[in-house]
Amino acid sequence: MSDTLPILIVDDQPKLLRLIIELMSRLGFPDVEGVSDGPEALKRMRERRYALVISDLAMAPLDGLQLLREIRADDSLMNTPFILTETSFDFEDINHAHVAGADAFILKPFDINLLKTKLKQVLNRKPRRREAPLPAESTLSQEFPLLGKF
């Protein structure tokens, strides 16, 4: 599935990081690397290409959303598929991540079948093209004012 490129997992909780790496291995990904924060993920991505990044949303000093924005703003990294994970997503989290260019969202704890499905969907997408600047941060209520009336 990964065309021999490695997968990068970013999570600040060591047990979850090891668990996700193990799940990826069970799904047939032979080369999976893990890091515990966004700055280290960016450093690694600038040194090596990755088939996919799976990142926790809530991390410090650079959270998953900030990491995603950095990746999408970099022409050499912008086509890297990106999945955000978290124990819960609220409406605003999903909206901000969608605007920033997330390819998928997965709730923790992972169901291996859902993970497998999301991986297939994300890894089979066409590369992005930089046609226009990324949209400014917005909320759906700003884009669709009538939503606030219901």
Tell me what each language-model feature is.
Residues 14-33:
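Two-component/phosphorelay signaling modules centered on CheY-like receiver
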Residues 34-52:
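Acidic, metal-coordinating helix/loop segments flanking the phosphotransfer/catalytic sites
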Residues 59:
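Receiver (REC) domain active-site loop signature in two-component systems and cognate sites
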Residues 85-86:
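Hydrophobic/aromatic residues positioned on beta-strands within the core alpha/beta folds
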Residues 103:
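Short, glycine/charged-rich "phosphate-handling" switch motifs in NTP-dependent
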Residues 110-119:
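C-terminal output helix
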Residues 124-150:
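CheY-like receiver
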